[in-house]
């Protein structure tokens, strides 16, 4: 599996393999993880070639560089697979905007705080905005008081990531999940990703449905064929019994 690999003009960020390794001597780790010691590069390449594998430089800064005999294509595939699984397990953090007014009714306030709580419990952030209209802008303390109430009502699940500030006629703050809530959200995402990869258990709805259906269909077909044969054999005898005797 020794392959000649030429680097592009801009170089490559991949590990050096086979003939791209520049050192004259290398410390070699076998495909089974055993230490094979220091040897000339050509000897290491011959050993990898004998096993039908690649020689991969894993510690280029060591003296001499450390190389391992492995299937480099399989190694890259596994690395890509691990990166993909890690990416699926990551929590995508969203920023939800929650709009309130200086004179928000109590039921509207409670409704929006409940929704904000659920959103934060999912591992997301919330931008709580107070909209001022007309002369309401002269009473900014009302907006500050509402934002303080929101922060207090959600203190068990959220922390203030950005303190209240003005932007035009808007006052806003940003809430983020507490470390405990964020960790729980990440764990739920990981569990969901793991469950999605598992095949359904034998007794689960739909498991083995196609095989069972095929087997049942075959049995029914066999029964129908047997019945048809019996009817075909019985038909001549019945016809002879019913026919008049020749005179």
Curated annotation (Swiss-Prot):
Primary localization class, coarse: cytoplasm
Which stretches of sequence are listed as region Needed for vegetative and developmental functions, but not for viability? 182-247
Q: Which regions are flagged for Low complexity bias?
A: 207-217, 233-247
**Top-level taxonomic group:** Bacteria
The record's region (Disordered) falls at 1-20, 188-247
Listed Basic and acidic residues bias regions: 218-232
Localization recorded for this chain is: Cytoplasm
Q: Which GO terms describe its cellular component?
A: cytosol; membrane
Q: Which GO terms describe its biological process?
A: ribosome disassembly
* MF terms in GO: ribosome binding; translation initiation factor activity
- One Pfam entry for this protein is IF3_C
Name the UniProt key words of this record, in alphabetical order: Cytoplasm, Initiation factor, Protein biosynthesis
Description of how the protein assembles with itself and partners? Monomer.
Q: What does this protein do?
A: IF-3 binds to the 30S ribosomal subunit and shifts the equilibrium between 70S ribosomes and their 50S and 30S subunits in favor of the free subunits, thus enhancing the availability of 30S subunits on which protein synthesis initiation begins.
Give the NCBIfam families listed for this entry.
infC (TIGR00168)
Q: What is recorded about the protein's domains? A: The 66 residues C-terminal tail is not present in other species.
Query: Which family does the UniProt entry place this protein in?
Result: Belongs to the IF-3 family.
Please give the name of this protein: Translation initiation factor IF-3
Native source organism of the sequence: Myxococcus xanthus
- What is this protein's gene name? infC
């Amino acid at each position: 599996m020794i392959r000649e690999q030429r680097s592009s003009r801009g170089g490559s960020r991949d590990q050096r393999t086979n003939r791209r390794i520049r050192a004259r001597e290398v410390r070699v780790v076998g495909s089974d993880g055993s230490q094979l010691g220091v040897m000339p590069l050509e000897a290491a390449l011959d050993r990898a070639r004998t096993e039908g594998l690649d020689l991969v430089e894993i510690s280029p800064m060591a003296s001499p560089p450390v190389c391992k005999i492995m299937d480099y294509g399989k190694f890259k595939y596994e690395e890509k697979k691990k990166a993909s699984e890690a990416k699926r397990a990551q929590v995508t953090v969203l920023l939800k905007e929650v709009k309130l007014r200086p004179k928000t009714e109590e039921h509207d306030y409670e409704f929006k705080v409940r929704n904000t709580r659920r959103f934060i419990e999912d591992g997301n952030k919330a931008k709580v905005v107070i909209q001022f209209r007309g002369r309401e802008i002269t009473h900014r303390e009302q907006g500050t008081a509402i934002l303080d109430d929101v922060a207090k009502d959600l203190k068990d699940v959220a922390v203030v990531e950005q303190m209240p500030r003005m932007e035009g006629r808007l006052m806003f703050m940003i809430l983020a999940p507490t470390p405990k809530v964020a960790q729980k959200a990440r764990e739920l995402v990981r569990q969901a990703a793991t469950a999605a990869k598992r095949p359904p258990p034998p007794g689960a709805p739909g498991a083995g449905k196609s095989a069972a259906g095929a087997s049942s269909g075959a049995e029914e077909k066999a029964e129908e064929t047997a019945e048809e044969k019996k009817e075909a054999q019985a038909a001549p005898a019945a016809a002879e019994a019913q026919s008049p005797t020749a005179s």
